Amino acid sequence: MKKIVFDVTIISLILFFVQSCSIDENVTTTAATVSKSSTDYIGTYLSACGENKQQAKVVITDSGTEDVATANFHKISHSDSGCSTVLKTIQYNHTARAMGDTTDDDGNSVSKIYLVTVNVTATLNSTYTSSANEDEWCGLSNWEDDTAKDVTGKDCTNSLSESFSSALIQKYDIWHLNGTSFQKSEESTEGYPTTLDGTVYTKQ
């Protein structure tokens, strides 16, 4: 129950933060410049299966707050080259708000997206859970098969090869939607990127 209350509190704080905090000088808040809302991107987008047996997924949903979406970025590792059997999934959860349009370095019309971290979760399948508990991956010893664990703010470099950001971290992104093809940049904490990262996602 405490965990549920904490998560609800974090999400409520983020929605308030997105609506009311003063954005730094890199962010344009003039509503008249916005041609797309973050909710215009609502959908599930999936990348192709990579040679490294990894796949990326972006899930954008309506947060229930005007012009604010929930944006969840999934990094999925598989055991096979066809990406049919999932070994682990890292899910980065954010609130997202479109802050205006710009043109990237390649001439694409993109939306500037202001992100705030809600949390980060890791889900392991049975291939990893025993080792994860024995070696206390991310400082946790209660991993369960196919069950998401909160790794927000944890240093997991020795197990998941990554150190995860804390909640309420502000990030900047750019999004581009062309028909059913979606692209984004690598998020930055220092200002809006100027190039898309090259991964093309297809709307499902």
Predicted regions and their residues:
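Bacterial Sec-dependent N-terminal signal peptides
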Residues: K3-V5, L15-T44
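Disulfide-rich extracellular repeat modules and their boundaries
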Residues: S22-E25, C49, G64, N142
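Tryptophan-anchored aromatic micro-motifs
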Residues: A32-K57, A96, V200-T202
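Contiguous, well-ordered beta-strand patches that form the walls/edges
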Residues: S47-K53, N72-G179, E186-D197
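C-terminal or late-domain output modules
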Residues: A56-T65, S188-Q204
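N-terminal mature ectodomain segment of secretory-pathway/periplasmic proteins
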Residues: E66-N72
